[in-house]
Amino acid sequence: MLVLSRKANESIKIDSNIEISILEIKKDSVKIAIKAPENIKILRSEIYDIIKEENKKSILQDKNNIHKIKKLFDYFSK
């Protein structure tokens, strides 16, 4: 992991197409701006974690549904 220090109105470039700018620094928060191509997804980590958990639940539900459908198929195939 690369750790950098930046002041307000300074920025960081990632590759040639992503720029992270420090807009404002307050006592307990930092306001940033991110310029990136539209195909790059940018999410707050807490939102990303919620989406990840919901996707896991969905996969488990799909597996459960597939098992139920198989049982129905087996029942009607007799």
From Swiss-Prot:
InterPro entries hit by this protein: CsrA, CsrA_sf
Domain of life assignment: Bacteria
Gene Ontology terms: cellular component: cytosol
Signal peptide: none
GO biological process terms, semicolon-separated: bacterial-type flagellum organization; mRNA catabolic process; negative regulation of translational initiation; regulation of bacterial-type flagellum assembly; regulation of carbohydrate metabolic process
Keyword field contains ATP-binding: no
Function: A translational regulator that binds mRNA to regulate translation initiation and/or mRNA stability. Usually binds in the 5'-UTR at or near the Shine-Dalgarno sequence preventing ribosome-binding, thus repressing translation. Its main target seems to be the major flagellin gene, while its function is anatagonized by FliW.
Cross-referenced NCBIfam families: csrA, PRK01712.1
PANTHER family, alphabetized: CARBON STORAGE REGULATOR
Name the UniProt record assigns to this protein: Translational regulator CsrA
